[in-house]
Curated annotation (Swiss-Prot):
The keyword Transcription regulation does not apply. Pfam families: Lactonase. Gene3D superfamilies: YVTN repeat-like/Quinoprotein amine dehydrogenase (2.130.10.10). It catalyses: 6-phospho-D-glucono-1,5-lactone + H2O = 6-phospho-D-gluconate + H(+). Carboxylic ester hydrolase that may be involved in ulvan degradation. Ulvan is the main polysaccharide component of the Ulvales (green seaweed) cell wall. It is composed of disaccharide building blocks comprising 3-sulfated rhamnose (Rha3S) linked to D-glucuronic acid (GlcA), L-iduronic acid (IduA), or D-xylose (Xyl). Catalyzes the hydrolysis of 6-phosphogluconolactone to 6-phosphogluconate. Transmembrane segments: none annotated. It comes from Formosa agariphila (strain DSM 15362 / KCTC 12365 / LMG 23005 / KMM 3901 / M-2Alg 35-1). GO terms for biological process: glucose metabolic process; pentose-phosphate shunt. Pathway: Carbohydrate degradation; pentose phosphate pathway; D-ribulose 5-phosphate from D-glucose 6-phosphate (oxidative stage): step 2/3. This is 6-phosphogluconolactonase. Keywords: Carbohydrate metabolism, Cytoplasm, Glucose metabolism, Hydrolase. Belongs to the cycloisomerase 2 family. It is found in: Cytoplasm.
Length: 353
């Protein structure tokens, strides 16, 4: 398990590597990466050989993206290289199925940086760069466009961007030439309800549905996906209590496609909401809420076996481990908590030795 974190805007221990036991749900620290600033979002390559991290997020200067080679036997990371992201505050990394192309969402300078990766995991210089303008109705959060994340469709033929500031989902057609070089072509944007603030998104494994977590409205939006088009189906409240302001954060679907989870930040909330998924029509049914036993659950992950869910509580500096009931979707907290200052991103991979 790989943990990214905020280092309080100064060099520090930004990435932690743990060995996670998929029988007991216990974790043991293997290694750390020091002297990096705000390695706040991580993404594994599809083959598990490389780890990519945003660096220097939430600063007044351009952020960077770093590539690391993973030694899965020792649990060590070796820096391969870094590249400038071309904008401030990179918030998210997406990788296509081939592992050859990276999309970085820059939040403060609303833009998308598109990179190619070579066969050694090294990131080449920016291949394509797109900027965005726009605004929304929520003062402060929506004074300008804010690209928070991106997702390739399961067929790798479209890329969808969540624009928290403009209340829309930007769509790009993915083009591959004869040499398998990828380029992006801007297509229509999908407008969402004013004041929603789309943040993260996930596609269902059946390829028919997608679900977005809206930070500012505290709702999960369900969409039908057909021929690259997203059609809005319904909104579902993610919070258990009414709030003056909402701060929903992350969203994931269990490996078996039966349950959807989303994290909610905020006073008297800090919870994971649990929904069951109707695979025939994409509808969600509320199962319940589970407290995260910490403050500000920015990110969470379901382990590849589907038996555990782990939550990174950024403000309380702890990672909480839950055993997941695969039949009911409900969560049960385990005794062990991991202490990681500013924990903000989790990535998991099963290595066979």
């Amino acid at each position: 398990m790989f943990v990214g974190s905020f280092t309080d805007k100064k060099p520090g221990t930004g990435i932690h590597v743990f060995d996670f036991n998929t029988k007991s749900g216990e974790a043991q620290l293997l290694s750390e990466v020091d002297s990096i600033i705000n390695s706040s979002f991580l993404k594994l390559s599809p083959n598990g050989k490389y780890l990519y991290s945003v660096i220097e997020s939430q600063l007044q200067t351009h952020g960077k993206i770093a590539a690391f080679k993973i030694d899965s036997n020792a649990g060590d990371l070796k820096l391969i290289n870094m590249q400038d992201c071309g904008g401030r505050n990179p918030a998210h990394i997406e990788i296509d199925k081939s592992g050859k192309f990276l999309a970085v969402s820059n939040y403060t300078d609303p833009s998308l940086s598109f990179f190619e990766v070579d066969e050694t995991g090294k990131i080449k210089k920016i291949d394509e760069f797109f900027t965005f303008t726009g605004s929304g109705i929520v003062k402060g959060n929506q004074d300008t466009a804010h690209i928070h994340s991106s997702n390739f469709s399961l067929e790798n033929d479209y890329l969808f961007l969540q624009d928290l500031g403009s209340d829309c989902i930007h769509k790009f057609k993915v083009n591959l030439d004869a040499n398998q070089n990828m380029s992006l072509q801007k297509a229509d944007a999908i407008k969402v309800k004013p004041g929603s603030g789309p943040r993260h998104f996930v596609f269902h494994q059946n390829g028919k549905y997608g679900y977005g977590i809206n930070e500012l409205s505290g709702k999960v939006s369900a969409y039908a996906l057909l021929n690259g088009n997203l059609k809005f189906l319904a909104d579902y409240n993610a919070y258990s209590k009414k709030q003056d302001s909402y701060r929903s954060a992350d969203i994931h679907i269990s490996p078996d496609g039966k349950f959807l989870y989303a994290s909610n930040r905020g006073p008297n909330e800090d919870s994971i909401v649990i929904f069951s998924i109707n695979k025939s029509n994409g509808a969600l049914k509320l199962i319940g809420h589970e407290p995260t036993y910490g403050e500000h659950p920015r990110n969470f992950a379901i382990d590849p076996s589907g038996q555990f869910l782990l939550v990174a509580n950024q403000f309380s500096n702890n990672i909480v481990i839950f055993r997941r009931d695969v039949e009911t979707g409900k969560l049960q907290k385990l005794p062990q908590e991991l202490v990681v200052n500013g924990s903000s991103s989790l990535q998991m991979f099963t290595y066979s030795h």
